[in-house]
Structures are given as structure tokens and as C-alpha cells.
């Protein structure tokens, strides 16, 4: 299958592109800028473009059998001093369905959107969060295009565990250093609450399953392990060799401020994915502990001082 992975230089997109390539698909990554030399997808073909500015053309997409959309922006990507309503419109609520419509008009037959779980699990969160509402609109807007000629579906995953060299490794560098016990000025607690977590490898497997067997118009709530934030922090500490216990406090934390907890500090978003959907998509469960250990290894390797 000839597949275009939009957002293919990001953490989720890069893992997905490599997974699809390794299983035999002909993969191209779409990116706004140049691909770094140390990127996991540096050896893959690149299509330059920006879906938020509608720079892709029908001719760009015509060669592809399928598109994986893994470029969705979240609260970490919201720039300062921007019109938030306009940002989410371009990045999510209008931008994603418009890109899906372009893919459909180009003759692409399969489209898998990597979305987010908030609106799927707790629809009422869209009433209080512009981000969640935008994710919902992007999900529903793209799936509304489904018909006999265009199999479009959405995967709605939880918090994803993974890293690649570059921005994501740098984002986790200080957190891994703290987990190892090297940042005494950062408190050893986690905020109250928790959520579901999933490895990026499991998500990539689910994308592959959705490309092969996803139902037109379907939205799949995917996930793996329900963890408190303290349990997730503890996995990081254990993987980094920090040799201490992380307590739960009803206080914000530098690595998980209240702005990052969409459901609100102290609340838990826990669920079990539907077993039939898990089997259909064919992704691995029980992979979070391994993924945290891998994250620590990747971050350390990518951020180590040059010899």
C-alpha cells in the first residue's frame, strides 16, 4: 500500500511511518520543513506542505492509496499571543476535515485520523475546553466524508508514551534527569488524578490495523493501562534508576501543570478498550512499562553530551 503519513516527522507520525515501512508499505512522510538528519524517518521520501495553510494540492495526494493523519496539534503546541479560536480552527476543527476532503477528491481510498480520547470518553469536556471541542469537530468532520469510495475512520488514543531524537527527546530530558535523582529542586510528587496510557508502538500497530480493517465512519477508542499520575511518574523513576517512591499530592507539578490536565487535577480518565475493537485493530496491550524504559533510553542517547 502506498501511504502518506502527515505529521510523519513528529513522535507519533515517525513511529507509525517506520512501523508501516517495516511491514512492507511504501511510505512517504509529509512535513512542513526539512527532516533532521537524526530523525527516524530521515531515509524516507518527504512531501513538503502545511495542511493548516492548505498548501497541499490534489496532485500531491493522487499517488497515494491511503493517508494517515498524525499531525493533530494539542495544548502543548498552542503558541502564546495567538487567537486561540483561530488556531484550533486551522489546526483541528476546519483544517483536518478540509484536508480529508482534499484526500477524498484526489482518489485516496483510505484515511486514518489519529485523534484524541477526551471527547470520545467524556463528551461534556468539549463544553468547557476549546481544545477538546476542536478535536471532536475534527474527528466528526472527517468521518462525515465516509462513503463507499472513501474509508475514513478515527483512532482516539489516550496519553502516548514514546520519544524520538529531537524535540520530544529534549522535552523529556529534564524529566528523565529528575527521575534519575539529578534534579533535587524539583519536588518528588505527582499531582492527584490519572488517565489511560498507551505506547506509541501499540498506537502504530492500531494504525496499521485501521488501514487494513477499519470500518468507514468508525471512531475507535484505543488504549492500554489505567495509571495514576503517581504510578506513571514511578515507572519513569524506576526506569531511570531513581530509587525512590513518588507520592501523590493534590498539587500541581512542574512536569504536569494544571494546564496539561484537561479533565482537571484530581480526576481520573480510566477505561477499558472494547475487546472486539482491540482484536480488529490488532494492537498490543500491556506495553506501557516497556515503553517507559525505551523512552528513558532514547532520551538519554539523544541528549547525551557529544564525546
What do the predicted segments below correspond to?
Residues 44-94, 120-122:
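NAD(P)H-binding glycine-rich loop region in Rossmannoid oxidoreductase-like domains
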Residues 6, 30, 70, 111-117, ...:
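SDR active-site strand-loop-helix element
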Residues 175-198:
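A conserved pocket-lining segment of Rossmann-fold NAD(P)-dependent short-chain dehydrogenase/reductase
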Residues 115, 142-167:
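Conserved beta-loop-beta element that borders a ligand/cofactor-binding pocket
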Residues 85-134, 153:
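Conserved Rossmann-fold NAD(P)-dependent oxidoreductase catalytic core, especially the SDR/UDP-sugar
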Residues 162-175, 210-220:
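Glycine/proline-rich active-site loop of Rossmann-fold NAD(P)-dependent oxidoreductases
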Residues 3-23:
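N-terminal Rossmann NAD(P)H-binding glycine-rich loop of SDR-like oxidoreductase domains
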Residues 193-194, 200-263, 279-307:
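Mid/C-terminal beta-alpha module of Rossmann-like enzyme folds, strongest
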